[in-house]
């Protein structure tokens, strides 16, 4: 079971020799108890904001609903170019925290009425500047005529970062798969659990100790805690972000 907001707060309160909180009085904390809760949240957000592509922030599991590439998808509409990345989001604060623009895939697998042979294609990311200079004029002239569309080969990002566009304009329904990562949220209730494995709880605690020592004007201990935090964070990144060897790739064949 993942470590909770209450457990993290009490671990720090014990170190300070202060009265611990309970699930019953967690919302009625005062003084140093409230300060510790604030520090836990600040440290937690420091950690999860360190890397927008932490595996535990993924919006879904790859292949959970379909063996295709990606962890979420949008279905296109014939004759429509632009689509919200997160359809249920009402503003940017509810959008995805990160989208991997190098991993968009188009397919007809799973589309109602489609059968083999299916269309499957990688979508090349094209900057909005390149698209508007070389493609927008001609394609927008035909925007109202879906017959002039086709199977998209490029994906573009809207200037406000909230939508993706397809070029050429889709001529039918396709599924567009991609990898998305959620924005982290603050801990609030006593039972709220951290999103990362308990193995890395000491990293969060060291970050919280840094803030506590700063609060008490203990610069030396704050520096020690910061070094412990940085060391733990490097290990965390090594285990969760860099488990595979580095390599160079050539996209000339991939998108041909």
Where are the model-predicted features located?
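Glycine-enriched, solvent-exposed interface loops adjoining structured elements
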Residues: 1-256
């Amino acid at each position: 079971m993942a470590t909770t907001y209450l457990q993290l707060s009490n671990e720090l309160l014990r170190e300070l020799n202060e009265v611990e909180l309970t699930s019953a009085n967690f919302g009625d904390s005062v003084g140093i108890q409230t300060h510790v809760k604030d520090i836990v949240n600040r440290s937690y957000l420091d950690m999860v904001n360190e890397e927008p592509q932490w595996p535990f922030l993924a919006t879904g599991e790859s292949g959970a609903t379909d063996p295709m590439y990606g962890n979420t998808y949008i279905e296109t509409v014939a004759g429509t170019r632009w689509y919200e990345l997160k359809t249920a989001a009402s503003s940017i604060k509810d959008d995805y925290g990160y989208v991997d623009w190098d991993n968009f895939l188009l397919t007809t697998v799973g589309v109602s009425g489609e059968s083999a042979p299916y269309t499957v294609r990688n979508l090349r990311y094209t900057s909005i500047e390149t698209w508007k200079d070389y493609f927008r004029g001609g394609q927008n002239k035909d925007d109202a005529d879906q017959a002039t569309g086709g199977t998209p080969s490029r994906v573009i990002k809207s200037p406000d970062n909230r939508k993706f566009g397809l070029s050429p304009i889709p001529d039918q329904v396709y599924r567009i798969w991609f990898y998305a990562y959620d924005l982290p949220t603050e801990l609030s209730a006593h039972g709220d659990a951290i999103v990362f494995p308990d193995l890395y709880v000491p990293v969060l605690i060291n970050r919280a100790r840094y803030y506590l020592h700063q609060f008490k004007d203990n610069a030396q201990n704050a520096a020690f805690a910061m070094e412990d935090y940085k060391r733990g964070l490097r290990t965390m990144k090594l285990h969760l972000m860099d488990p595979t060897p580095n390599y160079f790739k050539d996209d000339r064949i991939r998108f041909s």
